Amino acid sequence: AGPGPGQIRAAASAYGGEHWPAAADLPLPNPNSSVALPRLQSGRLLIAGNGAGNRNQLLLWLSDDAGKNWRLTRTVESDADDLVEFSYPALLQSRDGRIHLAYTWRRQGIKHAVFSEAWLDGGPP
């Protein structure tokens, strides 16, 4: 999270990680928690993270323009109880194109969800 209230900070290296620009705030909410951000095989960027306030939501945002603009595409988990937590997401896309999301579920276990990139755009999982 960034220095402002509930900000995600990000930087991208065009030099294989040898040189980095200054990090910038993304216009996405974040309650000082970890996020996952892979580049999909299509070239789009996907973020899994929590919404504003607490960790009682797990959300997916998608960027079609290398991170300049983001849109909320799916709510994976949501609970009205602020003490419920869905956290520490990890994302990867397997060779077959399926996207795998693993995260801590209610501090009781690890949940694993598998879905297609089309699901992010409103299609079937």
Stretches found by the model and what they are:
Residues 1-125:
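Asp-box/BNR beta-propeller blade signature and adjacent active/binding-site loops
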